[in-house]
């Protein structure tokens, strides 16, 4: 078996085009365009790249994009004050604070300070809680993006045994909640999991998000399983690879996401989708 490649670039562009069309229709109807505030603290090179891609996506779909590039010396109270201002700004529907924040800043405190109705990253405990209660509003971008990929490829996950490897607040935990909501029997594996291999070998759907190159050997993948690789790891050679041994896994899986070009583009597309959703649901009065 050779796996069908799940093309995240293609699907993300489709999602962005759909959002762009809805924004155009809003503006033509006399409504304002959605607004996204992107806050970057410090000079982290990877964060600058991510923020750049988010800002470009905003412009592409016709959003109002407001950028706040703050120096590393910014205090926590100054950042909280900025968030207060953005929470009150009627032209801003979404607030994104790029992680990681500089040392000394309490990221939990800062993310919780964002108005849940403008939390387009889906990190606020209110929004994660809604997902856990099966009444989601703004959903965490990477897990929601993965669900979109599975839906667009008509992969029926209800009843599948899904294994999520990684239990971070950003991907692993909300991914588990998304898969429960989708009707999967879901196992979450983490650093204390015993006999990881046995869990992977039983999985109909595997989602891996640990940030370790080739962490999951391809031979562990069950014949016909669906493999979603969230990892993005840069080797010394400069090559980007995922958390799953791709070349072997693709000979066993029915569907697989490549790295790059799989999950990554969906994160930004979902952020854009969430911002439009926040505008339509909460701020179009």
Curated annotation (Swiss-Prot):
It catalyses: (6R)-5,10-methylene-5,6,7,8-tetrahydrofolate + NADP(+) = (6R)-5,10-methenyltetrahydrofolate + NADPH; (6R)-5,10-methenyltetrahydrofolate + H2O = (6R)-10-formyltetrahydrofolate + H(+). The keyword Nucleotide-binding does not apply. GO terms for cellular component: cytosol. PROSITE patterns: THF_DHG_CYH_1 (PS00766), THF_DHG_CYH_2 (PS00767). Its EC number is 1.5.1.5, 3.5.4.9. It comes from the Bacteria. GO terms for molecular function: methenyltetrahydrofolate cyclohydrolase activity; methylenetetrahydrofolate dehydrogenase (NADP+) activity. Pathway: One-carbon metabolism; tetrahydrofolate interconversion. CDD domains: NAD_bind_m-THF_DH_Cyclohyd. InterPro entries: Aminoacid_DH-like_N_sf, NAD(P)-bd_dom_sf, THF_DH/CycHdrlase, THF_DH/CycHdrlase_cat_dom, THF_DH/CycHdrlase_CS, THF_DH/CycHdrlase_NAD-bd_dom. The keyword Hydrolase applies. NADP(+) binds at residues 166-168, 232. Pfam families: THF_DHG_CYH, THF_DHG_CYH_C. One of its GO terms (biological process) is purine nucleotide biosynthetic process. Keywords: Amino-acid biosynthesis, Histidine biosynthesis, Hydrolase, Methionine biosynthesis, Multifunctional enzyme, NADP, One-carbon metabolism, Oxidoreductase, Purine biosynthesis. Belongs to the tetrahydrofolate dehydrogenase/cyclohydrolase family. PANTHER family: C-1-TETRAHYDROFOLATE SYNTHASE, CYTOPLASMIC, C-1-TETRAHYDROFOLATE SYNTHASE, CYTOPLASMIC-RELATED. HAMAP family: THF_DHG_CYH (MF_01576). Catalyzes the oxidation of 5,10-methylenetetrahydrofolate to 5,10-methenyltetrahydrofolate and then the hydrolysis of 5,10-methenyltetrahydrofolate to 10-formyltetrahydrofolate. Homodimer. This is Bifunctional protein FolD. It comes from Aliivibrio fischeri (strain ATCC 700601 / ES114) (Vibrio fischeri). The gene is folD.
């Amino acid at each position: 078996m050779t796996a069908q490649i799940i093309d995240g670039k293609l699907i993300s562009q489709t999602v962005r085009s759909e959002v762009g069309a809805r924004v155009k229709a809003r503006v033509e109807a006399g409504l304002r365009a959605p607004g996204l505030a992107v806050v970057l603290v410090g000079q982290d090179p990877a964060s600058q790249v991510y923020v750049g891609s988010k800002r470009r996506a905003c412009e592409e779909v016709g959003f109002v994009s407001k950028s706040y590039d703050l120096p590393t010396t910014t205090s926590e109270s100054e950042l909280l004050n900025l968030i207060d201002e953005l929470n009150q700004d009627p032209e801003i529907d979404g607030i994104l604070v790029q992680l990681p924040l500089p040392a000394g800043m309490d990221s939990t405190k800062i993310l919780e300070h964002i108005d849940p109705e403008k939390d387009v990253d889906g990190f606020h405990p209110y929004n994660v809680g809604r997902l856990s209660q099966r009444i989601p509003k703004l959903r965490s971008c990477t897990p929601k993006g993965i669900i979109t990929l599975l839906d667009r490829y008509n992969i029926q996950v209800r009843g599948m045994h899904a294994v999520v490897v990684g239990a971070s607040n950003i991907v692993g935990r909300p991914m588990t909640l998304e898969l429960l909501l989708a009707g999967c029997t879901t196992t979450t594996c983490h650093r204390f999991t015993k006999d990881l291999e046995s869990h992977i070998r039983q999985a109909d759907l595997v989602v891996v998000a640990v940030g370790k190159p080739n962490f999951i050997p391809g031979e562990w993948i069950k014949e016909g399983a669906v493999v979603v690789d969230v990892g993005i790891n840069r080797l010394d050679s400069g090559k980007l690879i995922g958390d799953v041994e791709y070349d072997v896994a693709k000979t066993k899986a029915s569907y697989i996401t490549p790295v790059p070009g799989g999950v990554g583009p969906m994160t930004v597309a979902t952020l854009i989708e969430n911002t439009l959703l926040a505008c339509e649901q909460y701020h179009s009065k």
